[in-house]
């Protein structure tokens, strides 16, 4: 579905000078048809070919790259297409069954076999924002819900099922937040017969159009967490906040700006018991 979203997004840019193939603008996934293909209607250029490649990432499970190749016989049309494609895909989020963000890395000339064709390849890094669920209690989902209560107008990535293409600061919502778990281990609180304690380290990514907007949201959230020293889990039990730290960095989409550490308890399941049947006591003490 992401590939079809990217296709429709490029199509919506209405790039000038695109050829026509089978009645549609010459936009293709991975590879363009041969120049001799009967689907071409007149000229075979300009054209755009995109290639989205995803790979496993131990930290986030999925990441990858996006390459967009543009080829034109008119150098000025190529230059305009480069500008529009870079602007359209830099810091842009695509959300369907998976949410990804594309960030422009570089643009390089593309060598073509036809000397009359000018080509460029735009390279984009792809960062994935996978949805992970934790049972029986989910601190990620619980913190995301807590943040949504404080900031109802933000888009909580991974928590709201809605296909969308989004750029920070453009339209409503103008801000997105993503929560993920760094680690979960045995807690330092003593566990009991009724409850086991777990320590979780969570990260919060606030994606906005400016550092000032992000800092404002982070400041409010940090003050609230430090004041309350807890937030509610899905079952109403508390997540006890022990430490909150914030820092701006150059890799917001990867590391985020806030790290939170705390503990939560999970009630043990009561094992069913059965009474002993069929035993009769006879006789007595002598």
Which ranges hold each PLM region?
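Extracellular/virion structural assembly segments
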Residues: 59-67, 71-95, 102-105, 192-201, ...
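Helix N-terminus capping/helix-initiation residues
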Residues: 12-13, 112, 210
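Hydrophobic beta-strand residues in large extracellular and virion-surface proteins
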Residues: 6, 10, 50, 66-68, ...
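Small/polar-rich, solvent-exposed N-terminal microdomains that initiate assembly or binding
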Residues: 1-58, 79, 83, 87, ...
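Short, charged interaction patches at domain edges and termini
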Residues: 1-9, 53-61, 98-153, 184-199, ...
């Amino acid at each position: 579905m992401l590939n079809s979203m990217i296709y429709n997004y490029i199509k919506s840019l209405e790039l000038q000078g695109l050829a026509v193939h089978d009645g549609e603008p010459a936009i293709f996934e991975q590879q363009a048809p041969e120049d001799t293909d009967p689907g071409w209607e007149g000229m075979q250029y300009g054209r755009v070919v995109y290639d989205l490649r995803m790979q496993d990432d131990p930290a986030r499970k999925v990441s990858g790259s996006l390459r967009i190749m543009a080829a034109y016989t008119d150098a000025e049309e190529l230059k305009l297409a480069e500008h529009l494609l870079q602007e359209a895909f830099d810091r842009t989020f695509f959300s369907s069954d998976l949410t990804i963000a594309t960030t422009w890395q570089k643009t390089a000339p593309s060598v073509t076999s036809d000397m009359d064709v000018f080509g460029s390849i735009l390279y984009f890094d792809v960062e994935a924002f996978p949805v992970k669920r934790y049972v029986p209690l989910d601190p990620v989902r619980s913190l995301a819900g807590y943040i949504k209560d404080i900031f109802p107008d933000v888009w909580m990535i991974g928590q709201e099922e809605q296909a969308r293409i989004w750029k920070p600061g453009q339209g409503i919502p103008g801000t997105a937040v993503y929560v993920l778990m760094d680690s979960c281990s045995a807690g330092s609180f003593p566990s009991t017969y009724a409850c086991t304690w777990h320590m979780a380290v969570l990260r919060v990514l606030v994606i906005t159009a400016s550092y000032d907007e992000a800092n404002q949201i982070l400041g409010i959230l940090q003050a609230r967490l430090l004041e309350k020293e807890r937030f509610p889990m899905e079952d109403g039990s508390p997540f006890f906040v022990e430490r909150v730290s914030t820092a701006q960095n150059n890799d917001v989409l990867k590391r985020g700006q806030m790290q939170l550490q705390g503990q939560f308890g999970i009630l043990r399941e009561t094992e069913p018991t059965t009474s002993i049947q069929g035993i009769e006591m006879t006789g007595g003490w002598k």
